[in-house]
Amino acid sequence: MTEAMKITLSPQPADARWGEKATYSINNDGITLHLNGADDLGLIQRAARKIDGLGIKHVQLSGEGWDADRCWAFWQGYKAPKGIRKVEWPDLDDAQRQELDNRLMIIDWVRDTINAPAEELGPSQLAQRAVDLISNVAGDRVTYRITKGEDLREQGYMGLHTVGRGSERSPVLLALDYNPTGDKEAPVYACLVGKGITFDSGGYSIKQTAFMDSMKSDMGGAATVTGALAFAITRGLNKRVKLFLCCADNLISGNAFKLGDIITYRNGKKVEVMNTDAEGRLVLADGLIDASAQKPELIIDAATLTGAAKTALGNDYHALFSFDDALAGRLLASAAQENEPFWRLPLAEFHRNQLPSNFAELNNTGSAAYPAGASTAAGFLSHFVENYQQGWLHIDCSATYRKAPVEQWSAGATGLGVRTIANLLTA
């Protein structure tokens, strides 16, 4: 490894010779980032991406002005899926260094897990990685159960079983219980439900290559809520929280589900499948039924659910849906505190009725007459939340993954959302 390039911060503008828009300058001592007080964290992240683009793989964050948030902003832009990068961190007080170390451990886990190729990360591997991460931070305060394959069908998890049965890799439900109270009868404060589709071909409603090439990341919701629980634990979470990960491949085979199939769920709902590429909501429904049965104060589900959310927000914001205005406001406040991008999109009672079927109570996709795809997907999920008008948040994870690099991110996973959910859990 070469000698470290020193990176310093300055509130002064760059020398005019660098141009009036220069955010960094280079001198004999290293590189100086010129902060303007308007968006310093974003400036640091974008500068770090440029520094990585110069091929500089060993840096030392030096001088005054560095804190955990600024160090983290640098790392968010500097980290990339290829190659090795080394950062020598500045001196921070114990609390700030612990916060930074926890972000590096947990959010990097989220990014690396989402970036992993589907060949290496199937449903069982995803569930086990989640168990390992949370057990590492929570120790004996965690218990879990893994249900897979035909056991899912026998126990009535028909959405997850139906979607996953077309793959040689069995579908898996992880039910994890973080109980710091030690009391088996303690009430469950919150349930987190994650979509863990480890590869999504679209099934018989097959995706084009341009839409399939990033579908190793379709388990981004599961990774995000797993990371959020782990991160909340490092921040002192003292309430009981349960995690449900619905993990499967969505592939084509002679045993794969087909258009026109009808799924009967444990809550009595019957769903006609008219698009096998709208599979995420089918597996989440099983997790939401289990979450509702716990009678928690709070249910949060997270999923890379719809292209419609990305059409609305790009990859810059996570989309938030809720009937509970006060709770939605709390999550948006948490997002602001953590400097993470969330945007609330519409969800109304009429969206619940925009999934008509001639053969079942619900269709798994809206018709051309109802084009608000992200809202109708949230409306579908609401049918599996017992008290959907209170205490439920749905996050459509449109900011989880980028197919190509941009000025502040490398290609791949971002890890956005972990801190916001953890903040809400520990508020």
From Swiss-Prot:
The active site is at K207, R281. Keywords: Aminopeptidase, Cytoplasm, Hydrolase, Manganese, Metal-binding, Protease. Its EC number is 3.4.11.23. Its main location: cytoplasm. Mn(2+) 1 binds at D200, D277, E279. It is an enzyme of class 3 (hydrolase). Binds 2 manganese ions per subunit. This is Peptidase B. It is found in: Cytoplasm. SUPFAM superfamilies: Zn-dependent exopeptidases. Probably plays an important role in intracellular peptide degradation. GO terms for cellular component: cytoplasm. It catalyses: Release of an N-terminal amino acid, Xaa, from a peptide or arylamide. Xaa is preferably Glu or Asp but may be other amino acids, including Leu, Met, His, Cys and Gln. Homohexamer. InterPro entries: Leucine_aapep/pepB, M17_PepB-like_N, Pept_M17_PepB, Peptidase_M17_C. Mn(2+) 2 binds at K195, D200, D218, E279.
